[in-house]
């Protein structure tokens, strides 16, 4: 029996169980994708338009090509049978998946550990404030330790509103986003791709899932908006193939 048939272990490994410790109404959680990957030259060669997989952090566990809005030719379904055997594979593609990785170091040379890409992304908005930046890491040993383990809380702490359930987060008071993070020449795209690359390079199960998507077009579902094409993730898939 391998890890892909042992669903409870696999589920806990990626932290996709529904019993989260925080008391946030997940249905009212903010939009999951804040930075849309910008396509580069030849990115259209990373995928085929006749196979489209759509996902987000609460995706239904449907066979490849049978999720809402997905596309797959009938004759190609057999190419994704192995992927379909993995429970909740779509959720693993989300930034919210708990796929711990190491990336970056502090001034003493200690590696930063991150619970998810979501944590890494939001932390890097606040490199101007070391204490708040480090509160997003698993190295954190302060009052934000719960947040450092929970992607939904990380989104709330690092989001534009800086609120949890309508209440201002005290730790955000007076802390502003780095001026070089957003904008035409901002770091946001680079940071997101760095996080994705570390996630898939350091997590063998996440890597396996990504590779099993083969040449499918990967689109992240965003609440009340159009899908976001995950060009960066597909670039990494190409690197790993």
Predicted regions and their residues:
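Charged, low-complexity intrinsically disordered segments
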Residues: 10, 15-26, 30-241
């Amino acid at each position: 029996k391998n890890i892909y048939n042992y669903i409870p272990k696999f589920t806990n490994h990626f932290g996709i169980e529904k019993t989260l410790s925080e008391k946030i109404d997940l249905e009212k959680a903010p939009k999951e994708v804040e930075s849309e990957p910008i396509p580069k030259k030849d990115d259209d060669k990373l995928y085929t338009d006749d196979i489209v997989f759509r996902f987000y952090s609460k995706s239904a566990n449907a066979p490849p090509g049978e999720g809402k809005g997905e596309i797959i030719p009938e004759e190609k379904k057999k190419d994704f049978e192995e992927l379909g055997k993995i429970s909740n594979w779509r959720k693993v593609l989300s930034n919210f998946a708990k796929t711990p990785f190491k990336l970056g170091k502090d001034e003493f040379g200690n590696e930063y550990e991150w619970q998810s890409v979501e944590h890494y992304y939001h932390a890097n908005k606040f490199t101007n404030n070391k204490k708040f930046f480090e509160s997003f890491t698993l190295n954190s040993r302060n009052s934000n330790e719960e947040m450092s383990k929970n992607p939904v809380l990380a989104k709330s702490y690092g989001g534009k509103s800086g609120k949890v359930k309508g209440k201002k987060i005290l730790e955000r008071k007076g802390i502003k986003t780095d001026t070089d993070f957003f904008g035409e020449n901002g770091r946001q795209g680079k940071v997101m791709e760095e996080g994705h690359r570390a996630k898939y390079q350091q997590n063998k199960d996440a890597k396996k899932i990504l590779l099993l998507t083969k040449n499918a077009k990967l689109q992240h579902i965003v609440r009340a908006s159009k899908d976001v094409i995950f060009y960066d993730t597909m670039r990494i898939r190409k690197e790993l193939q």
